[in-house]
Amino acid sequence: MSEFFNYDELTWPEVAALSRDVPLILPLGTGHDLPRLAAALANPARVGLLPAFPFGWRGSGLELPKIILGRYVGNLISSLREDGFTRAYCLTPQGESAEPYFQLPKPEYQIALPLSNVARDASPLPPDTERGKVILMPIGHTEQHGLHLPLSVDTHIINAISQGTANKVPQRAYSLPVMPYGVSTHRPSFAGTLSAGGRSFEDFWLGVIDVLVARGFERFYLMSGHGGNTSFLVNVVKYAGERHRRIFCATAFLHTSGPIGAAALEKYRTSKIGGMGHACELETSFMLHLRPELCHMERAVDETDFISTPSYYMDWLEGGSLVANPPWDDDTRTGAYGAGSHATAEKGRLWLESAIMEKAGHVEEIHEQQERREARRNEGFGLWGTNSK
């Protein structure tokens, strides 16, 4: 009988140690028949399950064009193949025609099985009853986080913040399921890291907004738990605003980074500048609070020897005025930026509360912005008097 394990619960050294012929499966949705999958793989000793892709395909409740979904997922599978994993596949629902749902870069990248518990016709996502709310779009990633944290850090953190925000202001916001895959431009440096590719990532999220705007939604907040997503989300916001002139679509730099978050970080942090970056005091504290069983604090190594100059250095809220992307290998031996040894679960609890409070405030601002702007448009303000589109 095959043993299934969760790929994203491993640390990057544990991924590096995996046999390159172990099957790694990225499923579209959940509820697949795992014994049938094992049989299709010839019953290997072990099978790694990657986080389920939450939506985008027919029957998921939020369908995108096949070419957009295929490029996004194809890049993820290619990431694993490029790292030498010869049996990396996307698990897709097989249609009634017995044909795979979409085409990936190579046919062998895909395993299609008949639907089991996966719904054929899921309810619309979000439900139509959520129109008028800010639609939260939490996006994490599956990537290395030092020696002591799993690949799932960014996903767990932003999911907790997004769900916490929706629960705090349920009449004002609705959270989509978290997306566990983003963009990493440092992917080859440390094992385990995937990347959707910048342009495919932008096309996917712009496609999500296109679909939801067509259904009558008009307020969106793209929330990221992974720094590598940031610049691409800015582009999505710009494209969305240009394409759909009567919506309000926003993003922000990560989380715990506005006035509320900055004050909380300053109050409770014990590391110096350079101690908060990646697999650091902040992210490790979040994980000690949210998923302590996945933290291996005995392996934590503080990495604060970032090559710093006055306009280019590393910390959560600071980094100088220069924007650059040198190899991670220049500044870290273990994949961490910061001082994870300073982390505590109590700090994680306090910082999560601050992050949720901050995001709830952003929700209110998005509502205010959209309402005030629509009022001006309807009054015929400026050029809106001659162009109402």
Predicted regions: what they are:
Residues 1-221, 227-389:
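Extended, histidine- and acidic-residue-enriched regions that form the cofactor-binding/catalytic faces
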